[in-house]
Regions:
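Membrane-proximal intracellular helices of multi-pass ion channels
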Residues: 1-479
């Protein structure tokens, strides 16, 4: 284990986090607020991480170091990111600050705040900006900024990129990262322009665009997008969250005008089919409730289906009050999640597709024991290592979900609250059901449950293994 390089890279990335605090600091100054919570945080990060970043180390690392670097950076980033909240005095405890920061960077969108609008503008901006930073991944940004990492940077992006397979658009990983971030920035600016053009104030358009881009769910308003009864806003948000839920490699193909290759993506077709089916089912279930016609029911359904499957967690209605069938459909979407190599969370549609094809193959083997059938996606054979990794991931996911739900249930709340809290944090969705639904918050949970959920958020965002590696004795044995 090349520990010197591990700590050096952690230090360099955290200095980037410190630099990102300049934006909320400028917002605080613009609105005449105290900037000292940002200044203190930047100073502390500089004192701790500047010596690490200057540490002499050989840039030699492999998959083991890659997973350790990713796990450490995300844990340390959440800790440092919680300091502006703590220094601002707006939060009751450091555990609450850690919960909010973890929810921000992992793009979960769960909150412990009963009154978001009481926060200073600078803190609100930082809260939503953490979604944007965490959406594409801090290590993907680091790879774009530090091309000196060379070919070995694939170990970092492999550990951080969501999904069973890693997107590589061009031979050099650093150039791939730059392309991805270029697309990410362009789409974010487009969302800001659209929301501003639809009638939102520029500040609100910006902070909500950060949340939409990261498929996070934080808002500057207590009522989320229900506070903006402007024509077209919900359609802009639903369409944008849908786009950010897609594999970013598809946007690269679109820029190259390779549209046939885009439609060949089986994950894309599966994802769109799930969205369409869920929208129709929920609209059919809601029609007798709202009595506003099929179009209004489809509008409500489409917004919340895209919000949940993208793991954004925005809302215009309290779906915790919807019929049980609609709530069950949304819970299933929480499991499914978005596409691989997107900013969304969940299990990912590619894994669901692989699992369905494994099930189909096993059923056929029962009928035809000598049958030899390979699993394919997009016309290519899925490697056995990918199949094994998918099954191990799903097994770990369910075990962590059950363990987290068990710990949260110690607070004495209902099964729906305990289970949906665990699922919402592990899948990075944000809101759960009942008291922790869209119009509620997680302040009622105990510190143990909040820490458990914070750990689940990071574990779910990194897709389990980089966090498990940190607790593996075998990884640290030969340091």
């Amino acid at each position: 284990m090349n520990l010197r390089f591990v700590f050096k890279l952690v230090g360099r990335v955290e200095l980037m986090v410190a630099a990102s605090l300049l934006l909320p600091l400028a917002v605080a100054l613009f609105y005449g607020e105290s900037p000292w919570h940002f200044v203190l945080t930047m100073g502390l990060i500089l004192c701790v991480c500047a010596p690490l970043a200057r540490m002499p180390a050989q840039p030699v690392f492999f998959q083991r170091e890659g997973f350790v670097i990713v796990g450490l950076i995300w844990v340390v980033t959440c800790l440092f990111g919680s300091l502006p909240f703590w220094f601002s005095g707006c939060f009751a405890s450091f555990v609450d600050c850690l919960f909010e920061a973890s929810s921000g960077f992992t793009t979960t969108g769960a909150t412990i705040l009963p009154d978001i609008e009481a926060l200073p503008q600078g803190i609100q901006f930082w809260r939503c900006f953490t979604h944007w930073l965490g959406g594409m991944g801090v290590l993907v940004l680091a790879t774009a900024v530090f091309p000196s990492l060379g070919a070995r940077s694939q170990y970092l992006t492999r550990a951080e990129t969501p999904g069973p397979m890693v997107v590589k658009l061009v031979p050099k990983q650093a150039k791939t990262s730059k392309i991805l971030y270029g697309i990410y920035c362009a789409m974010t600016l487009a969302v800001i322009a659209l929301l501003w053009g639809a009638g939102m104030p520029l500040y609100d358009a910006a902070v909500h665009a950060f949340s939409i881009a990261g498929t996070g769910g934080f808002s500057s308003r207590n009522a989320s997008f229900a506070a903006y009864p402007l024509p077209g806003v919900d359609l802009i948000v639903a369409t944008a969250t849908l786009l950010f839920s897609l594999n970013f490699g598809l946007f690269f193909l679109a820029l190259r005008r390779r549209f046939r290759e885009i439609w060949r993506s089986e994950e894309l077709r599966f994802f769109l089919a799930v969205v369409a089916l869920a929208t129709v089912l929920i609209a059919w279930d809601l029609d007798p409730v709202y009595h506003q016609g099929a179009l209004e029911s489809l509008r409500y359904a489409f917004f919340h289906v895209t919000s949940v499957i993208s793991t954004s967690g925005f809302f215009t209605e309290d779906y915790a009050l919807w019929p049980q069938f609609s709530q069950m459909v949304l819970v299933l979407l929480m499991f499914c999640g978005s596409c691989s190599s997107s900013t969304g969370g969940g299990i990912k549609c590619a894994r669901v597709l692989i699992l369905l094809r494994i099930l189909r193959r096993e059923v056929r083997r029962i009928a035809h024991p000598r049958c030899v059938e390979v699993i394919k996606m997009d016309g290519r054979v899925v490697e056995s290592s990918t199949i094994r990794g998918t099954l191990v991931f799903l097994g770990c996911y369910m075990l962590i979900l059950l363990a987290a739900g068990l710990i949260i249930s110690l607070d004495g709340y209902s099964f729906s609250i305990s289970f949906s809290s665990a699922l919402a944090s592990l899948s990075n969705v944000g809101p759960g059901l009942e008291l922790v639904g869209p119009t509620g918050n997680f302040s009622l949970l105990s510190p143990l449950s909040k820490v458990t959920m914070s750990l689940c958020m990071v574990t779910g965002r990194l897709e389990i293994f980089p966090i498990l590696v940190l607790f593996s004795r075998a990884v640290w044995r030969h340091t």
